[in-house]
Amino acid sequence: MTDKKYIIALDQGTTSSRAVLLDHNANVVEIAQREFTQIYPRAGWVEHNPMEIWATQSSTLNEVVAKAGITSDEIAAIGITNQRETTIVWEKSTGTPVYNAIVWQCRRTADITDKLKADGHEEYIRNTTGLVVDPYFSGTKVKWILDNVEGAREKAERGELLFGTVDTWLVWKLTQGRVHVTDYTNASRTMLFNIHTKQWDDKMLEILNIPRSILPEVRNSSEIYGQTNIGGKGGVRIPVAGIAGDQQAALYGHLCVHAGQAKNTYGTGCFMLLHTGNKAITSKNGLLTTIACNAKGEPEYALEGSVFIAGASIQWLRDELKTVHDSFDSEYFAQKVTDSNGVYVVPAFTGLGAPYWDPYARGAIFGLSRGANCNHIVRATLQSIAYQTRDVLEAMQSDSGERLQYLRVDGGATNNNFLMQFQADILDVNVERPVVKEVTALGAAYLAGLATGFWKDLDELRDKARVERTFSPDSDNEKRERRYKGWKKAVKRSLEWAKEDEE
């Protein structure tokens, strides 16, 4: 216990940067949020400006302190959680990025991953890194930058460049270039990290021709990495004391810290993690084996299913189809009809993630009849999020041999009661929605707070956790299985759609 009153979690996401101020009871006191530009240079390419990421994130940090009317000497620590895999390479001496951040959604390196498969590296990558060979992960993005940005490879070989995922970039900027680190959870998403030895893997660096000198030091998710000054009275220096990739942070924020506990985060993408304790389970069903947070001692493991498009499909309804005015309208319009009228939406806008891993899949609407209307499409789009979650759960249960008893949920789309009820129905398990919705930020705050003595231990945190609503499934198993069978048929027809165009 300390005399400090607050923890700040920096939640650097795919579409916005947020700062969340929490008190000792793990209640959200204040939030500041700023969106930033999404850059689409070509079909399937997605970039961010690293300087804009930093500008929005640093401004929200200052803003949340100002909005709350507090001073920096009341803040115990800062925890960071971030969009994972997104790749930044910058000059060590100037801090200037050599290229835009290549975002996790970006598919530009599909040709590199195809070559990795053709060269027979799939099994080694799966066994060593826990990952499948896919453009999603950082390794091929780093290679692309070094191969395609003029002079980058030569600078990297001379030790003049640094690589980092977004957490590394933020810590570098917060500490004014003094600290170049990542944590185990983010390192495990690069395709460059051996999750068993917990070291950067020399063979992967050789395969992708990436110099070791650009890599950050890998540290635990809960420790003091450095300090930052955000002004205020006396300009007190505040410890940066927690780092976790967004999905692992959410798992920790739900206090899913034991084998068999699972959560699903409904953000831009949809991410389900099942904690597997100290056992790294190699999936036979297209899931990832990844590292989970542990505030004390060695990091542990989880199985993860990554769905690329979840909340982004609701944005698509709003921005491109213009069938809803804002994301909150989707629940209203989905309930204007009693069913989806046989319509299925497969939102494979950037390919399909787990358990299919097909970068050439594309989005499609199936089952349209003359009676289908916009409300059916809205309803089917929401249902697609729940169907994709079931795809992942089926794979998890097969790999782990365990039947899930409940699913803890977080993310913006969990405010949609229609979606949460349909999720419970299609999974046939209880879905638990917590009182504090900012679970990803909560996880980062917990990690930073435990590292600095703001909270004593997990037992203290468990006493603060509360469920706001439990959604229980309906008992109609025949309807559940009929609907899911239709989804599987729709997905099958979406696979490899773009492959011929790119050959």
Swiss-Prot record:
Inhibited by fructose 1,6-bisphosphate (FBP). Pathway: Polyol metabolism; glycerol degradation via glycerol kinase pathway; sn-glycerol 3-phosphate from glycerol: step 1/1. GO terms for molecular function: ATP binding; glycerol kinase activity. Key enzyme in the regulation of glycerol uptake and metabolism. Catalyzes the phosphorylation of glycerol to yield sn-glycerol 3-phosphate. Belongs to the FGGY kinase family. ADP binds at residues 14, 18, 268, 311, 412, 416. Its EC number is 2.7.1.30. ATP binds at residues 14-16, 268, 311, 315, 412. HAMAP family: Glycerol_kin (MF_00186). Transmembrane segments: none annotated. NCBIfam families: glycerol_kin, PRK00047.1. GO terms for biological process: glycerol catabolic process; glycerol metabolic process; glycerol-3-phosphate metabolic process. Glycerol binds at residues 84-85, 136, 246-247. Sn-glycerol 3-phosphate binds at residues 14, 84-85, 136, 246. This is Glycerol kinase. PROSITE patterns: FGGY_KINASES_1, FGGY_KINASES_2. It catalyses: glycerol + ATP = sn-glycerol 3-phosphate + ADP + H(+). InterPro entries: ATPase_NBD, Carb_kinase_FGGY, Carb_kinase_FGGY_CS, FGGY_C, FGGY_N, Glycerol_kin. GO terms for cellular component: cytosol. Keywords: ATP-binding, Glycerol metabolism, Kinase, Nucleotide-binding, Transferase.
